[in-house]
Amino acid sequence: FTTGSCAAAAAKAAAYMLLSGMEKTEITIETPKGIPYTAQITDIQRKECAVTCAVIKDGGDDPDVTTGSRIVARVSLPEEQPDSGEKRTQAEILIDGGSGVGRVTKPGLDQPVGNAAINHVPREMITKEVLEVCHLLDYQGILQVEISVPGGEELAQQTFNPRLGIVGGISILGTSGIVEPMSNQAILDT
């Protein structure tokens, strides 16, 4: 499964644990291809207003430098929930990259300059899965999701990222949610 699938699964699990107070050691998401992915959840750290957990990336037979990496999600409540005066009908999910996730420095990529290198499909997956938890647990406030990859800065040196203008880490990628071995599309998406 892609780094995007791993990020979405970790974010969903962290959101569930934060909002429910219950621990999750596995979680299932639906990939954009409609294939369910059940991920094992590791490295759970709980605080009053945040939960951090990880999913270990399994790239299958694809020679992917991220295979075996921990894709970490930290889901937190903002220090203050802004009051816009209107009642929310659903939660708002704010996504950013942390340590080991690259930042876009050149125009023409999937994300604008300055954004974390978390492509639009993984962003949509994370949002969909976290909103599903919010709906299930009747939460309509703001949640902050930060995706990080320990060792991502070093891994990025083995990718096209430095040449593409993505600095500081790897990209969180995926269009189908499934690693498609040695595909031309995977190279273009990078």
Regions found by a protein language model. Name each.
Residues 150, 154, 162-190:
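Glycine-rich anion/phosphate-binding loop at the beta-strand->alpha-helix junction
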